[in-house]
Amino acid sequence: MRSREKSLGKGKHHEATFEDQLEPVTDVEDAILKMAAELLLPGLRPHELVILAQLCHFVSERLDDVPQHWSAGSPIGRSELLDAIRTEFPQSDGSDTQFDSAISVLDYSYFTGPNCNRFGNQPLVEAANSTGTENGTAYRLNSRFADMLATNRTFRIFFADTLRTGMANCRDIFREAAARQQVFDHMFLYERKYSMADVMRLCGWKKENTPQNVGGYLLDKETNTMPIFVKYAASQYEDEFLSTQEMKYFSKNGRTPQSPEFRWALNGIGPNWGQTHFVPLFVMRKAEEAEGKYYYVGHVAAFDNPQLTTKPDASGQGSVKVTLSILRLARPIDPELYRHLVS
């Protein structure tokens, strides 16, 4: 993908190959393609895909076609972009929270420093102060990114193909969910596997975090979400299913029932608790740890009876304070999935 220079020196009668038609791509362009392959290609969330499709308005183009002119279009208003997402993917979470999260991915403010650098440190979109749009908010392609698309045909074709394939994958996910009569729980599908990076983005966070900071769970107060990640291996001092609907769960070390995450979880208990709290539970079988993905088993409806207790520390020589509570899911786990997880 890097260069057509490899074809030099093959002789003047050398017949052009696919590789010969590739223009060089820069390190930044290559990093952007890496980001697109990791985040956009799987099609887990339509928001970024629809926003880019609206702003890029690519035409079908192949390397062996006659080169076509491409230029960035005019800014598009926030409400128009939201309408496009809601129209094409009515089952999706069309909230402002999810839209803002998608924008933060596309302007690169979402990523940690290392990931931002890994993906080229190059925003794809930016806000534009445009009159005539709702609240004056509109979005356009970042000028440098648009210039890359306009001047490097190979980069443009590869990026457009990734975008189209991501959109096709996304449509397949939503079509399959509809066929199975599955309803999205926020942006998650029951029994589907997600990586920790997927979960942070699909929770609508505007800033990702590192796996080390997330640990077994992390509260994001801006979105009122607290995903919980369990690597399942039942033992005396490990998180353990008590039934298909309840799990014995240990907090991070040093936490008490008065720690921020428990104060948040216990605040506003009542019939409307689920409207202000979203606690999705993800479980990974130890045998599948190399894959790095967790099954979504549903969201927590209650933290029952949180109590301060102790468990052995990492050395096994001492103990640490933790809070033990019973997580009660909104609905029981399917028996087949339950057996798979606990076996």
Residue ranges and their predicted role:
Residues 288-343:
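Compact mixed alphabeta submodule
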Residues 1, 26-30, 42-49, 63, ...:
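Short, structured coil/loop segments at alpha-helix boundaries
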